[in-house]
Amino acid sequence: MLDSLKQKKNFQRIKMRIKTGDLVKVINGKEKGKTGEVLKTIPLENKVVVKGINLRTKHVKPTQEGETGRILTEEASLHASNVMFFSKEKNLTSKIEYFIDKEGVKKRRLKKTGEVID
């Protein structure tokens, strides 16, 4: 899948403003309204994996003799447009903007409140 995306002529990687470890809220889909921490970002597909959200069950057959099969639950990816950064202090969602501070360091902040993230 990733190789086929890279081979396309006009393929461009989408910049993601959400990073691993951010707290996000789902704004669209069956899990709408739930919040969780981003475990993994997949920039080439513009997707994120959020802890405890969009769970899928996977049935695993026994591989060795004497072993029993299992049912695993794991998080599936969500499209990045379906999640939004969530601020615990202000209890609201907001878009993220980049800015350069006085020392010349690039940082992120919330557009609604101006709260600096990192």
From Swiss-Prot:
In the record, biological process GO terms are:
translation
Ordered alphabetically, the record's keywords are: Ribonucleoprotein, Ribosomal protein, RNA-binding, rRNA-binding
SUPFAM superfamilies from the entry? Answer: Translation proteins SH3-like domain
- What is the scientific name of the source organism? Prochlorococcus marinus (strain MIT 9215)
Q: Which gene encodes it?
A: rplX
Instruction: State the protein's name.
Output: Large ribosomal subunit protein uL24
GO CC, one annotated term: ribosome
Q: Which family does it belong to?
A: Belongs to the universal ribosomal protein uL24 family.
Q: Which PANTHER family match?
A: MITOCHONDRIAL RIBOSOMAL PROTEIN L24
Described purpose of this protein according to its UniProt entry = One of two assembly initiator proteins, it binds directly to the 5'-end of the 23S rRNA, where it nucleates assembly of the 50S subunit. One of the proteins that surrounds the polypeptide exit tunnel on the outside of the subunit.
- SMART domains to which the protein is assigned, alphabetical: KOW
| RNA-binding keyword on record | yes
Q: Which domain of life is it from?
A: Bacteria
Q: Which InterPro entries match?
A: KOW (IPR005824), Rib_uL2_dom2 (IPR014722), Ribosomal_uL24 (IPR003256), Ribosomal_uL24_CS (IPR005825), Ribosomal_uL24_KOW (IPR041988), Translation_prot_SH3-like_sf (IPR008991)
